[in-house]
Amino acid sequence: MATGVLPVFAGRATKACDILPDHDKIYEAEFQLGLTSDTQDIYGKITEHREVGNITAENIENTLEKFRGDIMQIPPMYSAVMINGQRLYDLARQGVVVEREARPITVYTLELTAYDEKTHFGKLEISCSRGTYIRTLINDIGDALGCGAIMTKLVRTKACGFTLDDCVALEDLQELANAGISAEKYLYPIEKVFGDLKAIKLNPHQEHLYRNGIRLDID
C-alpha cells in the first residue's frame, strides 16, 4: 500500500482541484525479483516463483534504460481505469481479464538506489508523469530481466509541489484533535500549489469571467 505525500484540500481550496498544475510525482519503491502476483505487488496473490539466477546491479541498470523517457504502459487489471463502463478492479475481482490499451507515460528519472544480489531485493527512485503505475513499471522491468518482479513498498515523496517535510501523519493529527490542539500550523495557503507558475495579470472583465468559472484563452 502506498504511503507518503497526499495533499488534502479543504474549504474553498477544493475549488482549485480541477485546475491543479500537472505536477510530476516522485516515488521511492522497493521490489523483489523472482515473484509475480495478480496485483503486481506484495499484497496480491503470488502467481509465480521464478529462478532469478545471477542478476547483478549492472544487469538491472542496463535494463532500466529501456524504461526511461516517453514509453507506453498497459494499465494493470487491478486499477480504477474504466472500460465499457466498468472499473478494471471490479472485473479483476470476478476473475475476468480484458484487453487494455497501452497509454503514454513519461519516466523522467529511474535510478537503482539499492540492490542485494543474495536476496534479490532492491530499491528504486522514480520521477514520473501522472497516470504512471509504479507496480506495473516494476512488473515490466522484472519481465525484461526474465525473472519477474513485484513491488513490496511504495512511498510518494513529492506531489503537487509538496514533499514529505511538508506533511503530517494522520495519527499525529488525531492526537492533536483528541487533545483539543489546533492543527492550523499544518495548513498551507492554496497559493503554494501554484507557486511554480508564471503570474498573469487579468483586467476587470477577465477577472469577473474567471471568478465565475469561465476558462480564459490568454496568449
For each feature predicted by the language model, list its residue ranges.
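Extended alpha-helical targeting/anchoring segments
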Residues: 78-79, 83-108
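The conserved catalytic core of RNA pseudouridine synthases
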Residues: 7, 97-131, 135-146
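Glycine/acidic-rich beta-strand-loop module
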Residues: 1-21, 90
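Residue-level signal for inorganic ion chemistry
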Residues: 8, 29, 85, 137, ...
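Acidic, low-complexity central loop/insert segments
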Residues: 13, 19-72
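Short, conserved beta-turn/loop elements at beta-strand boundaries and strand-helix junctions
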Residues: 37, 69, 100-101, 115-118, ...
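Structural signature of FAD isoalloxazine-binding scaffolds in flavoprotein oxidoreductases
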Residues: 18-33, 98-112
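Accessory RNA 3′-end/elbow-binding domains used by RNA modification enzymes
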Residues: 3-5, 23, 58-63, 121, ...
